[in-house]
Amino acid sequence: MAWAISGLLVILGYLLGSIPTGYLMVRALKGIDIREQGSGSTGATNVLRTVGKTAAIAVLIIDMLKAMVAVGGVKLLYFGVPSAIVPLDWKPWLIVTVASAAILGHSKSIFLNFTGGKSVASSLGVLLVLNPLVALGALASFLFMLGITRIVSLSSITGAIAVNLLMLVLHQPLAYILFAILAGIYVIVRHKTNISRILQGTEPKIGQKLTEEAETV
């Protein structure tokens, strides 16, 4: 029973993460496929360049909420299901497994032939449920780097690194620390083209032409 419930939660987490918010938003507002616009990503940054600020903010919030609901569902499970059915010592590991599934779904959506965004928004949503202090610290690191460089991709990578440091400093459970490492690596890998441009000095900054601006969310 425990394995069946856990497996179901992981599948639901992935399906929630897979909901293509950006794709649906742009399709509804402009009747076009966002994957054929800009960077081809379905994330909030590409929505910003394709539709505008209001739609991008809505996509950002919804993408965060998808991950929050997925992870929050696991925490709620332990309020209503006896530990004899789902062992209590599974909790942190089940939480991070579902979180990973939601993040993967955001970037590899089953509804869009396994395409999607860069998983930054969904990762932030997960962190807000795991540990709000870590989430706020990562956000502060992101904003600090953004203020200095005006490069969103570099700021996202900085935030991913900050998460790992904060998990260690705040003495989080081993499951959370391992999750932070793997999720951080995944987010950074999703930005590999951005990293290449950063090293070449060609990564666009905020305010440059939309066709040149780097996608990160």
From Swiss-Prot:
UniProt key word Metal-binding: no
Catalysed transformations (reactions): an acyl phosphate + sn-glycerol 3-phosphate = a 1-acyl-sn-glycero-3-phosphate + phosphate
Keyword Cell inner membrane (UniProt): yes
Listed name of the protein: Glycerol-3-phosphate acyltransferase
Location in or out of the cell: Cell inner membrane
Keywords: Cell inner membrane, Cell membrane, Lipid biosynthesis, Lipid metabolism, Membrane, Phospholipid biosynthesis, Phospholipid metabolism, Transferase, Transmembrane, Transmembrane helix
Membrane-spanning residues: 1-21, 54-74, 84-104, 126-146, 165-185
Enzyme type, top EC level: transferase
Bridged cysteine pairs (disulfide): none
Assembly and binders: Probably interacts with PlsX.
GO molecular-function term, one example from the UniProt record: acyl-phosphate glycerol-3-phosphate acyltransferase activity
Underlying gene: plsY
Function: Catalyzes the transfer of an acyl group from acyl-phosphate (acyl-PO(4)) to glycerol-3-phosphate (G3P) to form lysophosphatidic acid (LPA). This enzyme utilizes acyl-phosphate as fatty acyl donor, but not acyl-CoA or acyl-ACP.
